[in-house]
Amino acid sequence: MSISPQEVKKLRDATGAGFGDCKKALSVAGGDFELAKKKLKEMGIVSADKRSGRDAKEGRVFSYVNTERVGLLLIACETDFVAMNSDFVAFGNSLIKQLVESGRDILDEHQELEIKNLAATIKENIYVSKVYISNIASNELVKNYLHGDHSKIGVFVKFKIDDVLKMQDEKLNNFAMDLALHVAAFSPLYLSVNDICLNYIKEQEEIFMRQMESSGKPENVVKGIISGKLKKHLGEIALLEQGFVKDDKLTVKEKIEEVSKLILSKIEVVEFKYLSVG
């Protein structure tokens, strides 16, 4: 039977076993997820590598962008020393380039084997923790950024540009890079307040209500305080509502509008991604 890459990825995430081993186990199990997990244990795959049980709390973020896609990759390891190792860094840079150029966010058998070989050479638990690949349209501009020599934070920001002739505008590109730096510094969780789920907003409102229970203030005053706290909190986690890193008198949304007027073309942030070690 045919086993999809998504099924293989699910089993791989659950067990830590390699791509090829997961695919083989699923095939033997006829696609049954729980049975495939059992087969991996029977094969001794899940616990075969003693290093796989050790904590890998360090790592490095890698990024690559071409005209069609942008990608972020987080590879975990046990020590910061290994995260700076030249072989580790070269492998990560090569892998993210391969993934972006292929458009895949799942490693193939050869790439899985390369990781195993690297782990055996370096003698640490090394694995791909997160991969994110995003397509770039012809009217979109992307800026990616890796923070510091150790690259423990990696981000990209994607803009939609109404007038594609403005794509090379210096003011636009400088702002785009500044916003990538902003995302790295402030690690927003959402693009806009509208993207925040209602359940989260309700839970946060209830937290503020409990905090005000013993305040002794009139109900209408309490409601006003809670509303203000909620607005402030949501603004802190939504990119467009955050104070811009280079001019906190303006929100990111207001800065975007300002740059749009400067370059005589509407620009819009349509996506961002933030990855960090730990």
From Swiss-Prot:
GO molecular function: translation elongation factor activity
Pfam hit, one: EF_TS
Keywords attached to this entry: Cytoplasm, Elongation factor, Protein biosynthesis
Region (Involved in Mg(2+) ion dislocation from EF-Tu): 79-82
Keyword check for Ribosomal protein: no
InterPro entries: EF-Ts_dimer_sf (IPR036402), Transl_elong_EFTs/EF1B (IPR001816), Transl_elong_EFTs/EF1B_dimer (IPR014039), Transl_elong_Ts_CS (IPR018101), UBA-like_sf (IPR009060)
Keyword DNA-binding on entry: no
GO cellular component: cytoplasm
Main location: cytoplasm
Coiled-coil regions, chain positions: none
Residues annotated as signal peptide: none
Location within or outside the cell: Cytoplasm
Family to which the UniProt record says this protein belongs: Belongs to the EF-Ts family.
Function, as annotated: Associates with the EF-Tu.GDP complex and induces the exchange of GDP to GTP. It remains bound to the aminoacyl-tRNA.EF-Tu.GTP complex up to the GTP hydrolysis stage on the ribosome.
Protein name: Elongation factor Ts
Organism: Borrelia duttonii (strain Ly)
